[in-house]
Each structure stands twice: as structure tokens, then as C-alpha cells.
A protein has these predicted regions:
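C-terminal structural segments of small proteins and small subunits
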Residues: 58-94
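Short S/T/G/P-rich N-terminal loop/turn motif that feeds into the first structured element of a domain
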Residues: 1-53, 60-70, 94-95
Length: 95
């Protein structure tokens, strides 16, 4: 299994709902066996620059992850979120 995690922050806090809605589009892509988009609770006060959103997904294999990233809804989500985001950090790991 491949676990995929993305962290995002908004340039402008007023765009938070638009970013959340744009990321939520990804839930309609059929290739993930588990998919979540959530807002960061920001309870850890050690970090100075916390992400605003987390995307977490699990895929059965690399082919499923590749198909997810090639899906038209993935591209639609990027077109909405990219202009509004400040930071994006992504990680893929075996689980």
C-alpha cells in the first residue's frame, strides 16, 4: 500500500473555503482506497508555520496513485487550489 499525504496553506485566509472545496473535488476520483481532506486543528504550538489543510489517501499500488494523479478531476483541483495556496508539501510512503 502507498500512503499519500499533502499539506497546504492558504496565501489569504479568506480563500480557505475555496481551497477546501477545491481539494474536496479529489474525493470523487475512484482510485484511492481511502481518501480524506481536513482542516488542520493547529493545536501544536511548537511549529511557527502550520499548514491549513491535509489531504490523506491510500492506494493499493503505484499504478493506482498514477491513475489518481492523471485523472481530469485531479487537474481541475490543481487549477482551483494552486493559485490560492502558499505552501504545498507532499509525501508518499509505503504502509
Amino acid at each position: 500500500m502507498i500512503r499519500h499525504v499533502d499539506f497546504f496553506s492558504a496565501i489569504n485566509p479568506e480563500d480557505s473555503n475555496a481551497i477546501f472545496d477545491g481539494l474536496s473535488i479529489l474525493a470523487n476520483i475512484p482510485h484511492a482506497s481511502l481518501f480524506e481532506v481536513t482542516r488542520n486543528l493547529k493545536v501544536d504550538k511548537i511549529n511557527g508555520k502550520d499548514p491549513d489543510f491535509i489531504v490523506y489517501a491510500e492506494f493499493t499500488n503505484q499504478e493506482a496513485l498514477d491513475a489518481y494523479k492523471a485523472h481530469p478531476l485531479y487537474k481541475k483541483s490543481i487549477s482551483i487550489v494552486r493559485p490560492l495556496r502558499d505552501m504545498r508539501i507532499a509525501a508518499d510512503f509505503l504502509g
